[in-house]
Amino acid sequence: MPMTNQELNKFLSETHVAVISTVDADNRPRSAPIWYEWKDGAAYLFTGRRTLKWRNIQDNPNVSLCVDWREPPYRSAIIQGTAEEVEVDM
């Protein structure tokens, strides 16, 4: 059953590990777990600059992010878009 926008925002705000899919150098999909924060309608992803997912995003910023809850009531959201680097204060 589809979630309302309010339910979706609440779900994405509560869950902090997702699976990101990127495109590798051979043009194949590559998926990996990633930490994120949902803020103001956007997913902010956290990864190191030496990771394969970072290199893939630098070469091809098209990504898909899957967030799911694997216990009843099962829920999931898939976000497709373009990744871009954002500077943050730590």
Identify the role of each PLM range.
Residues P33-W38:
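A short, well-structured catalytic beta-strand-centered motif of the EAL phosphodiesterase domain
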Residues F46-T47:
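Active-site-adjacent beta-strand anchor residues
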Residues R50-M90:
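Short, structured beta-strand-loop surface elements
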Residues M1-V17, P73, V88:
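Extreme N-terminal tail/first-helix region
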Residues L12-D24, V63-C66:
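A short, Trp-centered hydrophobic/proline-enriched beta-strand micro-motif
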